[in-house]
Amino acid sequence: MVTLAIDMMGGDDAPGIVLEAVEKALNDFPDLHIILFGDEKQCNIKHSRLEFRHCTEEIEMTDEPVRAIKRKKDSSMVRAAQAVKDGEASGCVSAGNTGALMSAGLFIVGRIKGVARPALVVTLPTVSGKGFTFLDVGANADAKPEHLLQYAQLGNIYAEKIRGIGAPKVALLNIGTEPKKGNSLTKEAYQLMSEDTSFHFSGNVEAKTLMDDAADVVVTDGFTGNMVLKNLEGTAKSIGKMFKSTLLSSVKNKLAALILKKDLNEVMKKMDYAEYGGSVLLGLDGNVVKAHGGSNARAFYSAIRQAKMAGEEHIVEIMRETVGEHNG
């Protein structure tokens, strides 16, 4: 049985989509137990494996992260993180304030001993539909070469255990594929990664080939990663708008759209973040999953499934025994 702590109040469309996702997850996974934190007046579901805990506070998207975590002790997010810290749950899931959740992860759940800086990891789509693990996408704007090495170690474990990829190809995001390309950060990180035998380092990869299955795990600093992530999201939305505009521009195009509807939907499904769940803060002494703030019920359900799998595969324990002990 895996127990997860869920923040019912976080997200643009909470608590509605959270409750819908929780109910589906409980019905789909007989080995899942959920502790739900939020306003009891807004909870309209009951289940034998659902435990509800009323909270009197809520962290808003506009709240200053660290201040909110310290002052709103009875918020649904803080109490969900505390449940992980106390060992009541193997992980927590929230679609709330990203900065606040990262702060809760750092200050409440805590880092694995030996991990210098946790990294925010996401799974992004590729042309083949396989996807790739990308980190750091915003936990730390600045990074040192040794931090990127740890990200590679953490990302390798995540790709193996959560995504089921044997011997993942781990690459470093750079401005060229040659070993000597890049700035001092990437050059030094390249050297460290090429000397590490705990994962398969495939070298540098350029941003233009990210979606062409260039690697299973791609590592970068949080500043670069966040910009790449937002650029990919924005580009996907813009292409979708261009497709729609073109297909609705004439009767001929509308007929073509009807014929191609199934194929177009398949392409859009490959590009949909909801298929891949949320982002995970790796390197913490517990599983912390951040669902997209604009998540629908399907996306939040995917985030729950992701957190459940992390608990089942004991990735925190593995990271503690490998990355943590190696650097402790």
Swiss-Prot record:
Its main location: cytoplasm. Its EC number is 2.3.1.274. Gene3D superfamilies: Isopropylmalate Dehydrogenase (3.40.718.10). GO terms for molecular function: phosphate:acyl-[acyl carrier protein] acyltransferase activity. It catalyses: a fatty acyl-[ACP] + phosphate = an acyl phosphate + holo-[ACP]. The keyword Lipid biosynthesis applies. HAMAP family: PlsX. Catalyzes the reversible formation of acyl-phosphate (acyl-PO(4)) from acyl-[acyl-carrier-protein] (acyl-ACP). This enzyme utilizes acyl-ACP as fatty acyl donor, but not acyl-CoA. This is Phosphate acyltransferase. The gene is plsX.
